[in-house]
Amino acid sequence: MPNAIHALVTESRNPFSTHIDQLSTLDMLAVINQEDQKVPFAIENVLPEIAQAVDAIAETFMKNGRLIYLGAGTSGRLGILDASECPPTFGTPHEQVVGLIAGGQQAILKAVENAEDDRSAGEQDLRNLALNEKDVVVGIAASGRTPYVLAGIEYANHVGCVTVGISCNPDSALAALANIAITPIVGPEVITGSSRMKAGTAQKLILNMLTTGAMIKTGKVFGNLMVDVVATNEKLVERQKNIVMEVTQCDRQQAEQALLQSNGQCKVAIVMLLLNMSAEEAKNCLAQANGFIHQALTLVK
């Protein structure tokens, strides 16, 4: 590895928290809060690289490829969290965004010893998904040196995937391997080496951007409304109705009727009402427009 562990920024001591164990609760939290405020600025510095990754992911989605997150510990759990939120939020198939964690399913709730050091598992987990060149693989490792992640990225490169590396240390092995390196430098953690803190926060914000940006670019959002939301609970049933009413300026009864006729598909209900057509006609119109409402409306006009 190009960086010895002790030399990593994420492993260094934070001079602003050296006496945190002697502070009052309020002062302790003030230190943590002050350090957390550095995270968005670190991300601002890497927005061009995040944009590159978003464009690559959007392109792969349009070709029916997948986004696959690969991480260990906190990094792996964050990938799984982001992946699990995509189907209800954007109506995507569960296999479109996948999160892999070193140590497998059991590692989600409980740390698995030495799992992150298992290079062979990084490659094997991707093989088990039948990885192909249409997929984008995002390796997440605060240190930038996690063997499980590095091996996975090496294999993904071999397959011909676009690879992205998210780390919080400069000049990391992960950044060197990935096609697109996203490296927000958030500085030393409040508790030395606890990368679940600022580094984890930075990773979460970046993953939010990757999936949200790609979903916007593939027609899953109209204005700033999640028009492919799946109504899996009462709150989301109401959200669907509110979205349809907001876009079409119809009343609640019309929204409910359109959603019923469209089998709970917001997009279809919206196009039905705006263009005064049947559910089947609206579906066909959206299919011709690759799922983009703006384009569907233009097609008919």
UniProtKB/Swiss-Prot annotation:
One record GO biological process: peptidoglycan turnover
UniProt keywords, alphabetically: Carbohydrate metabolism, Lyase
Disulfide bonds: none
Reaction catalysis annotation: N-acetyl-D-muramate 6-phosphate + H2O = N-acetyl-D-glucosamine 6-phosphate + (R)-lactate
EC assignment: 4.2.1.126
Active-site residue numbers: E85 (proton donor), E116
Other facts: A lyase-type mechanism (elimination/hydration) is suggested for the cleavage of the lactyl ether bond of MurNAc 6-phosphate, with the formation of an alpha,beta-unsaturated aldehyde intermediate with (E)-stereochemistry, followed by the syn addition of water to give product.
Protein name, as recorded: N-acetylmuramic acid 6-phosphate etherase
Species of provenance: Pasteurella multocida (strain Pm70)
Gene label: murQ
